[in-house]
Amino acid sequence: MAKPKIAVIFYSTYGTNHGVAEHAAKAAEAAGAEVRLRRVRETAPKEAVEGQDAWKAQAEKMADIPEVSHDDMEWADGYFFSAPTRYGVSASQLRAFIDTLGPLWQAGKLANKTVTATTSAQNVHGGQEATTLSLYTTAMHWGAIIVAPGYTDQSIYDAGGNPYGFSTSAGGFDDKGRAAVAHQAKRLVEMTRKIRG
């Protein structure tokens, strides 16, 4: 049986979602998947990025990670998304990439793929669940199959109890969070394997 192909796709301003994505990629590989770790293209003006030392440092840290492409979306059997929350939805950088996927969607090339999502926000009640649900709404339009973690492992409870997908306050990716992300990535691989046969 071929290994499930998982694209771990992230956008990160200050590093939280980068850390989540790297951990998810390692966990998916450990669960038997072939993995591509991809970052979303930065669309903010250069002066905005360079005007904040932490943002600039994070952009430099991620520079060697390939940008996600339509080829990656077509290649993958499943997607693990991680992006920060902005006003109750995903950061515009991720939304901008998703908005380019019309040709793949129209050709049915996003249908029957598995999807799971994680996020972070500045505050505990800063729209984290809404962000994850909005990504799942997009997946429904694609005809994709949502693989939420639910309450299928103690790690979900330990990390705050979000059944839609791991979420955290900015900078709060600790050992409990890593365990929850590893479980979510492993579950994505397992469900993708079952669906792909």
Question: Which residue ranges define each predicted feature?
Answer:
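Short aromatic-enriched loop/helix-cap "lid" or pocket-rim segments at secondary-structure transitions
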Residues: 47-51, 129-130, 158-161
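Short, glycine-/small-residue-rich phosphate/pyrophosphate-handling segment
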Residues: 111-157
